[in-house]
C-alpha cells in the first residue's frame, strides 16, 4: 500500500492532489481545518499550528506509515495575506510563519523518521518562492523559507532513500487566489495573461506535477517551476 499525507487537501491544489493520488490507489490522509470532500480520504482535521493537535493525530499517522510501502508527504497548506515590510506586525508575521514554516518542520520531525525508503517529501511553494512583488511581505518571506527547508531536507536525508522537491505553481485557479484578489475578475484576467498560454494554471495540473515528483527520485533537491512559462518584465 502507498500513502499520501497531504496538508490543506480541503481546497484547491490539495483537493486535486488528493483526488489524483486516490485514483492511483493511494491511501490519502488530509491534514487541515476543513475536511476534504474527495471520497475515501481520511480527514484528520485540526490546526496544523497546534502541537497538541499534531500529537493527537500522530498515532494514526504512524499507523498508516507502518502499513505503507511508500509515503508521499505533501506540504501544501499555506496562509496568505496582504502586508508589507512597513506594516506587518510581529504577531501577524508569527502567525504566518507558524503555518507556512513551523508546521512543516513539526510534521517532518515527527513523520520522516518513520517513513520507508521510496518515500517523498514534496513542498508546494510559489512563484514568490523565488522572487518578490509589493504588498505580500510575510507570504514571500515564508515561501522563500520553504526553499531552504527543501534543500536542507535533501541534505539531511542523504542515504535514507527519501527524496524531496519544491514545486512552484504560477497563478493557479484556486479559492485562495480568488480570495487574495477580492474576486476581482479583471485583475484575475490580467494575471492570466502573464504567461505564454495566457490562462491560469488548473489545480489538477499542479497535482500531476506532485504525483510525478513522488515517482521520480532523480529530481531530489530540485525546484520545479510550474507556471506555464511566466513572462518576465
Predicted regions span which residues?
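Active-site helix of classical SDR
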Residues: 108, 142-143, 150
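N-terminal Rossmann NAD(P)H-binding glycine-rich loop of SDR-like oxidoreductase domains
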Residues: 10, 18
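C-terminal substrate-recognition "lid" of short-chain dehydrogenase/reductases
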Residues: 199-226
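Substrate-binding pocket helix/loop in short-chain dehydrogenase/reductase
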Residues: 84-85, 92-94, 191
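Alpha-helical segment proximal to the catalytic Tyr-Lys
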Residues: 113, 155-156
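Residue(s) in the substrate-gating loop at a strand-loop-helix junction
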Residues: 126
